[in-house]
């Protein structure tokens, strides 16, 4: 019995809610017919509302109002307009994906999210490169294995986001890639981030030609590092006190017996 009463209560509540919704819709439709579609007085607003709610047996006024509402609907409703907008966005994204390959598939969502979080002001469009550097930081450096894509990454971002002309940056990137092509292949994006003077670059090239990759693979042994920590500057002073190669040779000529007896031990 309690369940039946609870069910009846819920039905009454739902019925009242539906009735209020229907009354609101009928009032809106009849008001539109009475005051916007025809001249005032041609359609009675109260009679139209009662017929719409089903409280009157006749439905002539309501039928007339429905016909007027059907005729007054736009040729392209809001839903159709939204569908056209969505289709246009899809076409644009398809064209971008076709033009730039997998770049938009890989980074498109990230760029859109960053644009929503940090919109570009009109007065900041002139400084497009600085804005891109602040927004994306070292994001494009992760793509170092793709070669030419890394060299033109900032130009591609400027073109996609519409921040301005990128001809100057293209020329600059081409020069930098031609000069550091060999270093980029060997070290990836590591050497590209270091700014060195011409003198240091020449010395590095000479060392590279002379020793190749040997000095990079072979470092100081662990025992030498332990001695360095333990004795500090004592080893440096001891090394300075050692004779040079020329002094050692003259010393060996003057004292041949010691040289024969101890060999090269006395040199150290």
Swiss-Prot record:
Region (Disordered): 162-185
UniProt keyword annotations, A-Z: Cleavage on pair of basic residues, Cytoplasmic vesicle, Disulfide bond, Endorphin, Neuropeptide, Opioid peptide, Phosphoprotein, Secreted, Signal
GO molecular function terms attached to this record: opioid peptide activity; opioid receptor binding
Main location: cytoplasm
Superkingdom: Eukaryota
Protein name: Proenkephalin-A
Biased composition (Basic and acidic residues): 166-176
